[in-house]
A protein has these predicted regions:
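Noncatalytic, beta-rich nucleic-acid-contacting surfaces in large DNA/RNA-processing enzymes
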Residues: 1-170
Length: 170
């Protein structure tokens, strides 16, 4: 169902963007579905980043897809703890100059100019909305279960879907 792009009736997956993402990713399990859901959020997809992810097959340069990816990226970049990295992520997300400047000061001590530019380029998407891994996995499980029932018992699936879901495609 998912690999054919049959997303109609699947909560959180009915958009055209999600359909294209599912077709490109060809999810084989809940984790692939969670990745697809995270990839369509503005922070992960901005500036052709989603397309770059698909071109590289997920094996290219490190990309920030979820909030936790940003935390790990920041922690690795300046060698700080995860809680400090989360503070910096939130600072970039909310565009708090004092927190961003504190991070930049730490970054200048640890990295060269080219590395600094690459790190800041990745973090510039932080103010846009992204999923945390927990939300991505939870919704991934939901969509996976719905797709299972859509394939296994379509009549019961559609009866329940039309009764309980308020889809824009109704």
């Amino acid at each position: 169902v998912l690999c054919r792009g049959e997303v109609l009736g699947l909560t959180q997956s009915e958009s055209r963007t999600m359909r294209k993402t599912v077709l490109a990713l060809q999810p084989k399990n809940v984790y692939d579905m969670a990745l697809a859901l995270a990839l369509i959020r503005p922070a992960a997809a901005d500036g052709g980043r989603k397309a770059a992810y698909f071109r590289s097959g997920g094996k290219g340069k490190r990309q920030i897809i979820t909030d936790e990816d940003a935390i790990e990226y920041i922690s690795d970049s300046i060698g700080c703890s995860m809680d400090f990295a989360d503070k910096y992520r939130r600072g970039f997300s909310k565009q708090i100059p004092s927190v961003m400047n504190e991070f930049l000061f730490s970054l200048k001590d640890k990295r060269g100019n080219i590395e600094q530019a690459d790190i800041l380029k990745e973090l510039k998407h932080s103010p846009k909305y992204s999923y945390c891994r927990g939300h991505s996995l939870s919704y991934g499980q939901l969509v996976w279960a719905l797709a299972y029932w859509k394939a296994r018992d379509p009549q019961r699936f559609w009866r329940a879907t039309t009764k309980h879901c308020h889809s824009s495609y109704r």
